[in-house]
From Swiss-Prot:
It comes from Coccidioides posadasii (strain C735) (Valley fever fungus). This is Glutamyl-tRNA(Gln) amidotransferase subunit A, mitochondrial. It catalyses: L-glutamyl-tRNA(Gln) + L-glutamine + ATP + H2O = L-glutaminyl-tRNA(Gln) + L-glutamate + ADP + phosphate + H(+). The active site is at K61, S139, S163. NCBIfam families: gatA (TIGR00132). Keywords: ATP-binding, Ligase, Mitochondrion, Nucleotide-binding, Protein biosynthesis.
Amino acid sequence: MSLLREAERCLVNRKAFASLNAFVTPLDRVGSWIERVKDADARRKRGAPKSSLDGKLIAIKDNICTRDVRTTCASAILENFTSPFNATVVELLEESGAIVAGKTNLDEFGMGSHSTYSHFGPVKGVRADDLGYVSAGGSSGGSAIAVATEQCYAALGTDTGGSVRLPAAYTGTVGFKPSYGLLSRWGVVAYANSLDTVGIIGANTSTVSEVFGVLNRYDHRDPTSISKATRSRIDEITGSTSKTRSERLRIGVPIEYNILELDPFVRETWRKSIQHLKNQGHTVHPVSLPATKQALSAYYVLAPAEASSNLAKYDGVRYGTRDLDSPDNTGGYLYARSRGSGFGPEVKRRIVLGAFSLSAEAIDNYFIQAQKVRRLVQSDFNKVFRLHNPLLQATLTSHPKALESDGDTAEKVDVLVCPTAPSPPPLLCSLENAAPTEAYTNDVFTVPASLAGLPALSVPVTPGDREQESPLGIQVIGQFGDDQLVLDVGSRLEKMNIQ
């Protein structure tokens, strides 16, 4: 099939699934992109494509800046904002020949777990018979639905505490959060700087790997981008240990993830996924991550604290839509009404929560303690992986000792395998009267990897005896920089029939 025909098929699907509300700003049916796709077709026929993404439609989450399309963050305060520049990841996609397929819907400023907190209306998952629509997950729900319904080849999202992996788990797609700092954040509207990661959603791990290969570049404009020297060291460490680990991997199963609230179908899918890897010749080992129990609480202190600082600039003066001054505004705050009407309820909730945790009265008891928990979470992961964390000082002097981490390496594992979400996607109607904080628990399995900055992948798995059921997300977590191994293990789960 020609690239132009593929693009036209995506547009047909977009019209067919318009009710799911995946896009804030869709790609126009006519425009200069058509000629670019035709040029890509010609290059492919000559055997000289720019990349494997040449001429492919890639959707962009609407909190990633694009010069030619508005960037709203699904918020009223940025409803008419158009960036004067492209984000680095968008630049890299366009240099590879990819076509921006529009901007996808999300929870406002990336704050949510079901993509319902959007100024442009909620994103809807597939219908569950006569019960209504199910959740598409959040906050990158629009990107996930766009991929799941073949409205694009792949999509970019952002993952702060699971915002790419959870939608992937709910929509039967593959969602990948790379190691923190590998993909540039320059041009990505910040939610929580120390956690935000550009993620990739695709129909399979092969597609995700293609996009990752294009975007995995150092960017001098991003102060959190991993330097070229560190990238070389990571490549040397992971390359030198790949032969040591060989094809027989040690698969870790975190015992703390087997919680009482875990849905029985999710638990059974997890068990069969582990058995499937065991049948392939890999060994399975229980591991303990004790700080995991405090990870979710720490996350919902740290992320809102950073958000309250990042969102202070949206006042209608420097950024954002300016609302009319209120006649009863006796406090003299020029921006009070602009922020009050511009932000939605969940964003306001997190701003207040973050401002409190950073206050002089609370910072020691909340923010500082949460930072300590974060370090404990990172330490727990470092203790269970055979590969030493390349960012630690020990690797600076002698990378051949990369496997000599704390304790006996024979007892350590290569990757962790666990559920992505504790339950299948809920019905949207069931969320209407639920307490806002109930949605926070959906991130319980995704937050730990985010706090530690580790690569994590959600792949759809359907047990062979439950093929009538929608697939569930199984998560693969690896050591920092071991992104390729995470993708490899994910492909083994994805391709095989789990019995």
